[in-house]
Amino acid sequence: MNKTALITGATSGIGRATAQLFAKNNFKLVLCGRRQDRLDILKKELGEQTPIHILNFDVRNREEVTKHISSLPSGFSKIDILVNNAGNAHGLDSIEKGSLDDWDAMIDINVKGLLYVSKAILPNMVSKKAGHIINIGSTAGKEVYPKGNVYCASKHAVDAINQGMRLDLNEYGIRVGAVNPGLVETEFSQVRFKGDTNRADTVYRGFQALRPEDIADIILFVVTRPYHVNIADLVVMPTAQASSTIVKKEL
């Protein structure tokens, strides 16, 4: 496999696991993230397996997104696969108690950031009439749960954007699909609960949550299908999870 893949949010969780698996399968990688130290470690870890280029920027900053992606070196500039993985949840509050800063962060990262990166990547895909965009959504984009309000709204937006992309880009032969995970044990809950490790740990206690590697396996499967096959929308949950609010736990 000699295709070039760009992965946002590559320094942890699903993004990191996807980078590791793609490297093993000989994809050239452009890895994006906000934490330079983690990007450096990842490049050192994976650089012996495949060519790696790292980009340190925040997807919320559209000028930085455009600048970094437009200035990719020639060996990495023709992106074949975009994995829009960067995303976060901030807070778990009823709507009347929600933080405006939390709302801004979720909309800016989960929705606008995805759009900024996609906009920067698309001209090349359109010109060559080929490419594959994987949008990492969530089961929160398929239903709404108590106190999930704005996070669920942001992931419903990802679901709508994914559908819209697939319609708009059909004439160019670009594949577009979403992978929508349920409960995956990552730094997600630590970020949502702002470093409250005890509260974050309770989210995954009493059942086997998905691992980042599980989602990476699925992403690899999606992007390695024959080109006439497009997996447009995929939902994956742990066996113990039936919905956002129904999880069989044995405590």
Model-derived segments and spans:
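The beta1-alpha1 cofactor-binding region of Rossmann-like NAD(H)/NADP(H)-dependent oxidoreductases
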Residues: N56-K67, L100
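Residue(s) in the substrate-gating loop at a strand-loop-helix junction
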Residues: S138
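Substrate-binding pocket helix/loop in short-chain dehydrogenase/reductase
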Residues: D93-I95, D102-A105
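Conserved glycine-rich cofactor-binding loop
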Residues: T11-S12
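Conserved glycine-rich Rossmann-like NAD(P)H-binding loop of the short-chain dehydrogenase/reductase
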Residues: F27-L42
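Active-site helix of classical SDR
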Residues: S118, S154
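C-terminal helical subdomain
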Residues: A178-V179, N198-S244
